[in-house]
Every structure is written in C-alpha cells, then in structure tokens.
C-alpha cells in the first residue's frame, strides 16, 4: 500500500 492508492491491496 505504501506509495499507492488505499483502494489497492498492495
């Protein structure tokens, strides 16, 4: 999730 949109699992 780090650095990515909160809606994505990563």
UniProtKB/Swiss-Prot annotation:
It is found in: Mitochondrion inner membrane. Keywords: Membrane, Mitochondrion, Mitochondrion inner membrane. Pathway: Energy metabolism; oxidative phosphorylation. It is a single-pass membrane protein. Liver and heart specific isoform. One of its GO terms (cellular component) is mitochondrial inner membrane. One of its GO terms (biological process) is oxidative phosphorylation. Belongs to the cytochrome c oxidase VIII family. Component of the cytochrome c oxidase (complex IV, CIV), a multisubunit enzyme composed of 14 subunits. The complex is composed of a catalytic core of 3 subunits MT-CO1, MT-CO2 and MT-CO3, encoded in the mitochondrial DNA, and 11 supernumerary subunits COX4I, COX5A, COX5B, COX6A, COX6B, COX6C, COX7A, COX7B, COX7C, COX8 and NDUFA4, which are encoded in the nuclear genome. Component of the cytochrome c oxidase, the last enzyme in the mitochondrial electron transport chain which drives oxidative phosphorylation. The respiratory chain contains 3 multisubunit complexes succinate dehydrogenase (complex II, CII), ubiquinol-cytochrome c oxidoreductase (cytochrome b-c1 complex, complex III, CIII) and cytochrome c oxidase (complex IV, CIV), that cooperate to transfer electrons derived from NADH and succinate to molecular oxygen, creating an electrochemical gradient over the inner membrane that drives transmembrane transport and the ATP synthase. This is Cytochrome c oxidase subunit 8B, mitochondrial. It comes from Oryctolagus cuniculus.
